[in-house]
Amino acid sequence: MMLTRRAALLGLAGAATIGASRAPADPDVVVIGAGSAGIAAALTARAAGLDVMVLEAMDRIGGRAFTDTATFGSPFDVGCAWLHKADDNPYTDYARAEGFTLQAHEYDLERVWLGPEPTPAHLVNEAEAAMSETITDAPADVAASTIVDLSSPVDEAAGDYLGALDMAVDLDELSTFDYANADDLAPNLLCAQGYGSIVVHRGRGLPVRLNTPARGVRWDGPGATVETDAGSIRARAVIVTASTGVLASGALRFTPDLPVATREAIADIPMGMLAKIPLKIRDQRFGLEPFTDVLLARRGRRDLYFLSFPFATDLMVGFVGGDLGWELSAAGEAAAVDFATQGLVEMFGSNAAGAVVKGGLTPWASNPWTRGAYAAASPGRYGAREALSRPVGDRIFFAGEALAGGLIQTCGGAFRSGEAAAAAVRAVLT
């Protein structure tokens, strides 16, 4: 597995200040999950004077914001990488104030191959812009594939870049309303030290119990009881930041069952897949400048995107999404690295394979505490996001990237959702 124990040092360093004595035995609020939404919820609730305990199933904080600093000899964001909508992102000013290095980077394609043939990148960029407008203007919430023309290689490439490689689902699984109601995420920033490092830094010192998955939530009496392998915790309210994939799996039981509308909403916002295949390159740059955006487009939804050598590191970071992302995640690291390496060969010739000295595959599909990359509403089910955001019995509150309004599928949006959930809890409890 590409992710090493040393890679989690930043997360554990943040947790090193945590002691059982610092977390109240029966807090006002239990927050389930110490990702971006959970960190924001805990910070906001504590600022409101509420006692908080955070339960985290993994051995680190940060959730899907995780920077691996060991595997490749330079920071690699296993999950969240771009600070989207940077002028309104809750991490931007914080990162600058704390000395993180930020670099503007939009992801307009600069180099494109349609199969083995180099193609002017502007053709795909223009086709994607036109397709985006068509989907945004859709009068009904339907699958995006039903209203766009994908007959030409350029249009198919644009559709894959817009759908699988951005929204984490192919166009036949993309809700037009879900897409239309997502914000324009420009401007975008990347962080030299890793976005995950920023998130962990912001969450340092919170009362988090690591390696403590919540197994159940009982809400059949006053307040709620959260059940863990180490015992039960009574609280006046619970903020649940687990992904919709985890919620749908039944790994977190609710007693009594959640209302039908809530359960249906969870099912209607399934997890999509965007997997990264980082390749470490030796003594070669393929004529690419750092941060160059490259797309190898193949017919049949087999597209591969690369972010080239960010911050002048030795990494070509490959991305695959949608059904292909799930397929390669199931096939495993060796198959994924071979797929990405062969992509380099198609674009740059047979010698490219010899330049690859190490590769990896991000684990979000197989991680039982994520079960996907980020959530995408099913066609016709855009309203499920609002339905899931409603509190249950004024005791159970949901938060996360799936409930981030216009900032769905983003780390900054998850933070805003956590803040909102904590504010709603405060309104009920105080």
Language-model segments: which ranges?
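N-terminal secretory signal peptides
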Residues: 1-3, 14
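FAD-dinucleotide binding site
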Residues: 9-430
